[in-house]
């Protein structure tokens, strides 16, 4: 009888320990989720910045990667990617390098078409159109004979100019993940077509689907802050073997001597 009581007591203590441990883990996970959201909120607070020249007076996170006296360079990038059953994958977008030292901005409007040959091999063709920015206006630096294309470039707006995440904390049922080995982190939300940012994208792009997108915020590097890592956002409307429709955007603050587009990992779905 005494042995039975001791056994029951031990079992109760084990169950209680497991319960307390689980609560502790849940609290730790919630704390990490909160840290990830706060990290994303820092960059999302830049949206919207209607006048791109305001970035000349904005300073981002600085670390030992910056040389003394370097004011840094902002890299902003937006592009739309569309592939349907009846068309090849095509991306159209722009990247700008906003140098705070020289207060000058240059970049490229890039059109990429990806085709597949009869053997199933993919081939990409990039066409770049160099641009500069003056008085918040995008100006091609080389003649463009195609009037429609020239107007598309001159009228181009980056997502950071019109996107708005003031309601980001109201987004429900987010899927937050963290990989300490990389380190990398992300937050995914299912949006509705009534979402402000979704409406803005549909207003500016001919998006050939009525499906509401998922918003993916992703980053890598130290959660406490780093100029080496990157943060990107993606609105994915459709993603399967035959069709891909998504929009990507990023705003990064980097040392001025390190403005290579590829080296900064702007997106794993980059040009």
UniProtKB/Swiss-Prot annotation:
Which residues are in coiled coils?
none
Query: Pfam families this protein is in?
Result: DUF576 (PF04507)
Query: What is its membrane topology?
Result: Lipid-anchor
Record PROSITE patterns: PROKAR_LIPOPROTEIN
**Protein keywords:** Cell membrane, Lipoprotein, Membrane, Palmitate, Signal
The record places the lipid (S-diacylglycerol cysteine) at: 23
InterPro entries, per the entry: Csa, Csa_sf
Instruction: Please classify the protein's predominant subcellular localization into one broad category.
Output: membrane
Q: Where is the signal peptide?
A: 1-22
Question: What domain of life is recorded for the organism?
Answer: Bacteria
Indicate where a lipid (N-palmitoyl cysteine) is covalently linked. 23
Query: Where found?
Result: Cell membrane
Presence of keyword Cell membrane: yes
Q: Please provide one cellular component term from the Gene Ontology annotations of this protein.
A: plasma membrane
Q: Which NCBIfam families match?
A: SA_tandem_lipo
What the record says about family reads: Belongs to the staphylococcal tandem lipoprotein family.
Please identify the protein, giving its name as recorded. Uncharacterized lipoprotein SAS2373
Naturally occurring in which organism (per UniProt): Staphylococcus aureus (strain MSSA476)
């Amino acid at each position: 009888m005494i042995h039975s009581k001791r056994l029951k007591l031990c079992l109760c203590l084990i169950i209680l320990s497991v319960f307390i441990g689980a609560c502790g883990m849940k609290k730790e996970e919630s704390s990490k989720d909160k840290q990830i959201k706060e990290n994303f909120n820092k960059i999302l607070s830049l949206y919207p910045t209607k006048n791109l020249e305001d970035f000349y007076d904005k300073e981002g996170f600085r670390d030992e990667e910056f040389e003394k006296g370097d004011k840094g360079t902002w890299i902003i990038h937006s592009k739309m990617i569309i592939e349907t059953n009846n068309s090849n994958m095509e991306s159209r977008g722009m990247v700008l390098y906003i140098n705070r030292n020289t207060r000058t901005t240059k970049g490229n409007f890039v059109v990429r078409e990806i085709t597949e040959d009869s053997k199933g091999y993919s081939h990409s063709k990039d066409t770049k159109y160099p641009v500069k920015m003056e008085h918040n206006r995008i100006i091609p630096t080389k003649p463009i004979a195609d009037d429609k294309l020239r107007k598309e470039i001159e009228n181009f707006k980056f997502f950071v100019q019109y996107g708005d995440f003031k309601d980001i904390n109201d987004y429900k049922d987010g899927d937050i993940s963290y990989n300490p080995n990389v380190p990398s982190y992300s937050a995914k939300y299912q949006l509705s077509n009534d979402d402000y940012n979704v409406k803005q994208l549909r207003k500016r792009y001919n998006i050939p689907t009525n499906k509401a997108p998922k918003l993916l915020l992703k980053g890598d590097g130290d959660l406490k802050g780093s100029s080496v890592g990157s943060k990107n956002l993606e609105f994915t409307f459709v993603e399967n073997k035959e069709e891909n429709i998504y929009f990507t955007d990023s705003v990064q603050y980097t040392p001025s001597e390190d403005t290579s587009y590829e080296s900064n990992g702007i997106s794993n779905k980059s040009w």
